[in-house]
């Protein structure tokens, strides 16, 4: 564990914003939701409320357990919203191959969650009031300097924009490839306004052809959201803003991401060596 160091960039190149196929449409900055965002009253379906979300592949239980944000379960998304995804046979076949370490690191794509991962929103009546996870800003600065970063949250666009404004400077915001909110999940109008389980299908970010399971990692507090690509998901404990929570989670994520940058195929490495927290981890400066 090395703490935060200056990032090692292949060929010594510095960061330059890129127009990358499939990741070029940044979320508008204004607080209003996009015009095409679903609207309408919040409706609940009794049938969906009673349904249970099926469990994923057995290998997915290797990640650390997460806390529940609410006692009531999420509904299963409707067929119109894509339903519940499963890993494709092609995905699993590639992930099951042996990992290979590269001689030099490369800029991988980090798809970053917000609420529960980097921030905590304690009061829904004050949606623009957030508590930052320890080291959140330092961690994000490092990721932006060392990797390509996209932000994908299941929150509504206006709340996503407020979280990003709190977490990043305007200059850092320009470095983010794309910021996606709830309107980027392809949800039906009813599901958009309901407490439905959402799935971050990484194929959404892979449409341009530059990114794929070999060079992409989703950082999220929900393993279920990464169900379609379980070995491209780094799951960390949900942050609830409590002083009793482990303070040095993000420095350990930082170290794991550094190793992923050396991997020829991220999915193969994560399958074999999933992210695990060290409960007695201490930052080097704290140990001095």
Label the model's feature ranges:
Residues 119-121, 226-227:
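Conserved protein kinase catalytic core
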Residues 93-101, 121-131, 144-150, 236-239:
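Short interface patches used for recognition in eukaryotic signaling and trafficking proteins
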Residues 106-117, 139, 145-148, 175, ...:
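Core residues of folded domains in eukaryotic genome-function proteins
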Residues 136, 140-165:
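Substrate-recognition element of Asp-dependent hydrolases with the DxDx(T/V) motif
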Residues 161-288:
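C-terminal cap/substrate-recognition subdomain and adjoining C-terminal extension
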Residues 94-99, 103-106, 133-139, 150, ...:
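Eukaryotic intrinsically disordered and solvent-exposed regulatory patches
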């Amino acid at each position: 564990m090395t703490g935060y160091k200056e990032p090692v960039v292949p060929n010594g190149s510095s960061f330059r914003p890129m127009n990358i196929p499939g990741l070029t449409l940044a979320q508008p900055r204004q607080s209003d939701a996009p015009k095409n965002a679903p609207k309408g009253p919040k409706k609940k379906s009794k049938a969906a409320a009673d349904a249970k979300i099926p469990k994923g592949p057995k290998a997915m239980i290797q990640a650390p357990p997460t806390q529940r944000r609410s006692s009531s379960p999420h509904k299963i998304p409707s067929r119109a919203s894509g339903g519940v995804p499963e890993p494709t046979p092609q995905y699993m076949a590639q992930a099951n191959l042996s990992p290979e370490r590269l001689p030099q690191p490369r800029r991988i794509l980090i798809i970053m969650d917000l609420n529960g991962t980097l921030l905590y929103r304690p009061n829904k009546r004050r949606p623009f009031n957030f508590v930052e996870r320890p080291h959140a800003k330092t961690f994000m600065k490092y990721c932006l300097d060392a990797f390509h970063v996209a932000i994908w949250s299941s929150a509504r666009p206006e709340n996503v924009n407020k979280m990003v404004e709190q977490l990043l400077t305007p200059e850092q915001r320009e470095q983010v490839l794309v910021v996606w909110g709830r309107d980027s999940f392809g949800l039906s109008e009813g599901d958009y306004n309901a407490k439905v389980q959402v799935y971050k299908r990484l194929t959404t970010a892979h449409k341009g052809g530059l990114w794929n399971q070999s060079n992409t990692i989703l950082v999220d507090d929900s393993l279920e959201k990464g169900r379609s690509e379980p070995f491209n998901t780094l799951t960390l404990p949900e942050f609830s803003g409590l002083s009793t929570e482990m303070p040095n989670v993000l420095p350990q994520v930082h170290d794991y991401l550094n190793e992923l940058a050396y991997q020829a195929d991220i999915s193969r490495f994560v399958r074999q060596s999933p992210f695990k927290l060290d409960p007695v981890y201490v930052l080097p400066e704290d140990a001095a």
